[in-house]
Amino acid sequence: MAKDQSMSRTASLCQEITVPKTIPVCIQDVFYRRVLEQHDAPAVCAWDGELTYGELDDKSSSLARILAQKGIHRGSFVPLCFDRSLWTAVAMLAVLKAGGVFCFLEPKYPLARLEHMCRHINAKMVLSGESRSELARKLGEHLAVNEDLLATSPSDQELVDVAPNQAAYVAFTSGSTGKPKGILVSHQALVAGILYNDKPMYLNRTSRVLSFASFAFDVSFLEHFWALLVGGCMCIPSESDRENNLLEAIENLQVNWAFLTPSVARVLNPTKLPSLRHLIMGGEPITQTDIDMWSPHVHLIGVYGPAECAGCTTIQSDYGKVESAANIGFPYAVTCWIVDENNHNVLVPTGSIGELVVQGPSLSEGYVNDPEQSAKSYITNPLWLSGSKEAEQQLYKTGDLVRRLSDGSLHFISRKDTQVKINGQRIELGEVEHHTRAVLGGNREVIVEAVKAGRPSSSLVAFIVTDNIPQSSTELFLAPDAGFKDRINTTKSLLRERLPDYMVPETYISINHLPSTVTGKADRKRLREQFTLLTRAQIKAYFGLEDKVKVMPLTEIELKMQRLWAKVLNLDLHEIARDDDWVSLGGDSLGAMQLASLARSEQFFLTVPEIFRHKTISMLCQNIKTDVSETIEEMKPFALLCDHELESDRILQTIADQCQVSQNSIEDAYPITSLQLDASIIPIQWGLNYTLRLEFKLPPTVDPAQLTLAWEMTVASNPVLRTRIVELTKDHYIQAVIRSKIPLENLDSSNMARYEPAVDVWGIGKPLVRVGLQANRFVMLIHHAIYDGQSLPLVFRDISNAYQGQKLALIHFAPFVRWSKSLDAPKRQFWIDKFAGFDGRVFPPVLDPSLDPVESRELTGHLNIVHDAFTATNKIRVTLAIVISWHHGTNDVVFGGVFARRSAPIPDIIDSAVPTTAMLPDRIKLDPDETLRYNLERDQDNILSLMLHEGIDDRDIEQLSPECEAVACKYGTLLAVQPDLATAYPEMFRERDMQYYGPICALNALMQCYLSPESATISLRLSESTMDGVYHWGRFLDEFEAVFHFIQKNPDVKLCYLRRQLDIPNPRSPA
């Protein structure tokens, strides 16, 4: 009887509920209303500029006319490939005004996935930012959006009328068939999804909305329109600030309204966000801990909804007043029905659990070019709507199980299928399974599940049925053998070529058989439960860490870092060793953001890329900036010249005469480093130019007066920019810091010649940097004596920070110079011991001394990097030593290395814009009777020892012993391994051209390796005096690549067998 009464009430409810009405208006029309109402109000506040509503309207219309001229019309699909920028908003509106349909492309996706997305929608053209134009070019016809392009807009080009029911955008999500599926959303659906929801979401003209969501997430569209359709302001941080400095970015942009997934919100400290008034959480389940953390500080709102429903489906408008975190609130733009999960023609009674079905004006149209999938998810005319005027409207089956509470709000239960969310990203497990089966081959059974296993957030686990299991085996989970681990390493690499990183399983479990339910289906629940029963030690076995000897953190810095790792990863301290891998312990990008944020509270300054690049506590602690390094005694000016044979008055007068300044203008003076000597004095012998010319195209919003002030502040705070080289006595040089300004010149015909390519700023006593500005072009000429590869981006960081109103710290170079010139007994003995017994043979030998060593040829190569127990630098060094040993006929190899020396015990040295680099000799003694792993491990120890004793110049090493003299400054090969610093420049200086006219190879052979996270580019330059038929350098480089890749796959092969394994003949035998 009770059930019949409940069913009766449900039927009555069905008659009473009304579906919200369609709002038949286009997105750009709603936006234009805001333009008329608040023409001069801020619409976009971004790292690269600001736009009012009027300016955004003008720019988007200009771009729309260009698109129309190029054939974009009603229904044309136009993907957008941008880094976070104000130009994103311009491009979105322009496509809509031209009648087109846009979609976002996440630039970090694998190229194959982006290509599929463009093919799937038959993309007419790709719009990109300038920084992504190269990627867009690979995807088809493209346009790079910038001010120069808008200047070509045809004023007479008519724009088409657009109907509200036309498609506006496509949101791509994971698809169970192995391919992403595109959700087609109309103008009127998006308008309804925004305007029906604005009040319960507290959106209005005062809202300053954060742009944070990945372009892979449908919320990225909504963030823009949440702001622009209600008259608010879109606040866009740079990608660097988004990843590494989110809390400060929110405050700097004065964000008061933000959508974040709970996983991201947990990274932030609510007490440090006074500007934030409304926090909207969604994308994944909200916990009571999230509510307790945030509701005392902000108005906490929860939203729920699949991408198929524009805006959001339900809103919990005040989480501070609900009893359960699972209460997802009420619908405003749609009507929610709850049906039997196995039969959508049957409504369930109030309070019963069923599948949520959505109906209303914010519903999407279906899936692009996928009628079969659309028919499964979208339905019309269910029995319980028969005879009603809404019966013919489309409804969407969400696949989510919910129940309706007595007040009409909804309580979320779970998914009914294999769709999951990881860090807010929607994933169809079937798509991951499809690709995993494909790369494994052999029709292997694979089940992928999202499992928490004691962590704050879920991760993907792949369960793989293993062939050829002995009949006696009864265990469901099998211990991973070496063969299984090798297959998984290959599988991961191949999956990353097909899927975004968040869709690649983190853990792979070998299973005896696929368990099934009584109905014959795969028993996913049992696999999840069995996995959660594994101990951490057992889980680590699947990362290949179970046999590793753990060395606990040693130093104070390492112990602090260990505590931070434990907090982020939810591990006990004893589980984290100094050389454990961040990823292998469960770290991901969100965890890295949290680690970077926590590290700041300990005065450690990390970035997300650094955490993944250095990946172990020991490596991180060698590369972080910290204020716990040893105290440096304050230095008085001229302290490093106290022992000079000349009296102080003579020194000052010599400096004043050569620099043509008064003695009062001399701030300090101290010895020059070997790098400075090599870059300034030595090249005079060959008439060489070591001046670097940089030209930057600045964002159009940059204010010249403000930039001039920022440059003056940078010069004042960086004495190295005011440094000049002085010849104190014959062949004895020092550097002097002069109290003088370096003007930012306005460039015109009268002074342009001073900034032409190939101009050399070098000169004894002369300034070594020159800067000019012409329109939005910033030009710098700077001599290598006052910068190195890592310090130069820091100069531009300081300019950018000063431009944004930040104070700059005064950075002195003298403490580092003192450290590099100190030669204590342990350091002296280290270098003497290092080269004891070396016979002094140089490789490659100079074959024709009459040839100029500066003239050179270049060969290039490529390495694919596998992340394992060894750093890329470690593997490159050992690889080079091996190949040199084959060509040189000895296992005792010496070559030069470029050392950044940023781990010096100087406060803030890692973040200081001073040239710390040195070229030092190095020696690797290979053991052919041991494995490659043994030789790599021995070199790891060698690297650590070098870092402890690198505070020395090569000319000082040369004086220590006859063996040292034989190698210091006389080695034939120089190796430079360095990260690709293209992204190290701040956003306003990203678009640049660099021209360098110095010698490319003053040594016999220079090998430069530029590292990115997954690969390395090799440049091998050889002086003309080295090139000869005896040495086949193309073959040398081929061997180098082959050895490097072999080492990664087979580290347990003995070195003496390596050449035979690779089928490489003896290079010293006749060809």
From Swiss-Prot:
> Which reaction equations make up its catalytic activity?
(2S)-5,5-dimethylpiperidine-2-carboxylate + 10-hydroxy-pre-flavunoidine + ATP = flavunoidine + AMP + diphosphate + H(+)
Superkingdom per UniProt = Eukaryota
Which keywords does this Swiss-Prot/TrEMBL entry list?
A: Ligase, Phosphopantetheine, Phosphoprotein
Q: What is its EC number?
A: 6.2.1.-
List modified residues, type O-(pantetheine 4'-phosphoryl)serine.
589
Positions of the Carrier domain: 552-628
Protein family membership: Belongs to the NRP synthetase family.
Its name, as the record gives it, is Nonribosomal peptide synthetase flvI
**Record organism:** Aspergillus flavus (strain ATCC 200026 / FGSC A1120 / IAM 13836 / NRRL 3357 / JCM 12722 / SRRC 167)
